[in-house]
Amino acid sequence: MNDYNHYFHFPREEWRKLEVSKDQILTAEELEEIRGLNDRISLQDISEIYLPLIKLIAIQYHEAIFIHGEKMEYLKKKESRAPFIIALAGSVAVGKSTTARVFKLMLDRWFSKTRQVELVTTDGFLYPNKVLEERGIMDKKGFPESYDRDRFAKFLTDLKANKEDVEIPLYSHFTYDVLDETRVIH
């Protein structure tokens, strides 16, 4: 059976029965703290949906690390840690940010802080408002043409190439604009 040719659909009742050996790893207070405005997510959702998904992500992560190690050994290259990137996509206001914060917190705990988990939003890769105005596309903010795709591609390339310090542009939800500041991940 080739897993890459199969997509699976699990009804919630079936999905929630998947065994996960971890205890509940979020409290009601933590969930409330990371929940976005109008997001409907409960501790039951965390237990029945997110926890099995985190377990599946952990399985995929360990498989990717094993394959990377085997490849480095075969190529007689010094083994370096390859990043494992998870991307979330969806339309506006569907809960991507809340899901990302839940993932980060749960993955931090799943790996007992032995792996660095970073949360990177694409907001920082938007063109600054000034550029959007100059190009007459301010009304397209958030659409593909409003993103600095070259900067985003360079970020991903640097990340995958294991560059020591990778800069992430920052975005302010107070000014609704890209900041001059960056954050560095190692």
Question: What are these regions, as identified by a protein language model?
Answer:
Residues 83-91, 134-141:
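Short acidic, glycine/Ser/Thr-rich loop/turn "cap" segments at secondary-structure junctions
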Residues 3-85:
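Extreme N-terminal, non-catalytic leader segments
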Residues 104, 108, 153-156:
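Short, well-ordered alpha-helical packing segments
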Residues 35-49, 118-121, 125-175:
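Conserved nucleotide-sensing/catalytic segment adjacent to the nucleotide-binding pocket
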Residues 105-118:
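Post-Walker A helix-loop "phosphate-sensing" segment adjacent to the P-loop in P-loop NTPases
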Residues 86-105:
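Glycine-rich phosphate-binding P-loop
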Residues 176-186:
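ATP-dependent NMP and nucleoside kinases share a basic, alpha-helical "lid"
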Residues 72-75, 85-91, 119-123:
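Short, glycine/charge-rich beta-strand/loop segments that flank catalytic centers
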